[in-house]
Amino acid sequence: MSEMATIARPYAKAAFDFAVEKGELSQWAQMLTFCSEVAKNEDVAQLLDGAIASEQLAEIFISICGEQLNEFGQNFINVMAENGRLKVLPGVLEQFILLQHEFEKVIDADVTSAIELTEQQKADIGAKLEARLERKVKLNCSVDETLLAGVIIRAGDLVIDNSARGRLGRLSETLQS
């Protein structure tokens, strides 16, 4: 997976820089999202693995994408096809989104709780994280009943384990040392 990220990173950076320069960040994110989904399609994936010339492959890919690609998006697909890199489009999208979030000062935060959080609790957690991280926070909430109570928050390198399971684990470690 890290090899795909290494290959995808320069393409994502080039697309990102171009999108910022043209003021078309959201349009490029939409184009790359669509192209990524096309590249993940089973039939298209078989085409990408086949022995088709890069020009033909680019033409086929662009025709599948149709109106979803503007002129610059089509050029981007042509360059990727010439270099045999259309298979890494999902990785390009991933890297592009990371760059976009960094640029827009947005961070994804995974919040795992023992029970479903209310809208007010989500708003409170989001506000506190935004103040602490000085970024806009996008919450991804999930439920894990094995936590017993409380929440675990993961945002970038930050991990806050305020679950009953986590507290019991730390208490157990303290008692054993």
Curated annotation (Swiss-Prot):
<dbReference type="GO" id="GO:0046933">
    <property type="term" value="F:proton-transporting ATP synthase activity, rotational mechanism"/>
</dbReference>
<keyword id="KW-0406">Ion transport</keyword>
<keyword id="KW-1003">Cell membrane</keyword>
<keyword id="KW-0139">CF(1)</keyword>
<keyword id="KW-0066">ATP synthesis</keyword>
<comment type="subunit">
    <text>F-type ATPases have 2 components, F(1) - the catalytic core - and F(0) - the membrane proton channel. F(1) has five subunits: alpha(3), beta(3), gamma(1), delta(1), epsilon(1). F(0) has three main subunits: a(1), b(2) and c(10-14). The alpha and beta chains form an alternating ring which encloses part of the gamma chain. F(1) is attached to F(0) by a central stalk formed by the gamma and epsilon chains, while a peripheral stalk is formed by the delta and b chains.</text>
</comment>
<keyword id="KW-0813">Transport</keyword>
<keyword id="KW-0997">Cell inner membrane</keyword>
<comment type="function">
    <text>F(1)F(0) ATP synthase produces ATP from ADP in the presence of a proton or sodium gradient. F-type ATPases consist of two structural domains, F(1) containing the extramembraneous catalytic core and F(0) containing the membrane proton channel, linked together by a central stalk and a peripheral stalk. During catalysis, ATP synthesis in the catalytic domain of F(1) is coupled via a rotary mechanism of the central stalk subunits to proton translocation.</text>
</comment>
<comment type="function">
    <text>This protein is part of the stalk that links CF(0) to CF(1). It either transmits conformational changes from CF(0) to CF(1) or is implicated in proton conduction.</text>
</comment>
<dbReference type="GO" id="GO:0045259">
    <property type="term" value="C:proton-transporting ATP synthase complex"/>
</dbReference>
<dbReference type="InterPro" id="IPR026015">
    <property type="entry name" value="ATP_synth_OSCP/delta_N_sf"/>
</dbReference>
<comment type="similarity">
    <text>Belongs to the ATPase delta chain family.</text>
</comment>
<dbReference type="InterPro" id="IPR020781">
    <property type="entry name" value="ATPase_OSCP/d_CS"/>
</dbReference>
<keyword id="KW-0472">Membrane</keyword>
<dbReference type="GO" id="GO:0005886">
    <property type="term" value="C:plasma membrane"/>
</dbReference>
<protein>
    <recommendedName>
        <fullName>ATP synthase subunit delta</fullName>
    </recommendedName>
</protein>
<dbReference type="InterPro" id="IPR000711">
    <property type="entry name" value="ATPase_OSCP/dsu"/>
</dbReference>
<keyword id="KW-0375">Hydrogen ion transport</keyword>
<dbReference type="Pfam" id="PF00213">
    <property type="entry name" value="OSCP"/>
</dbReference>
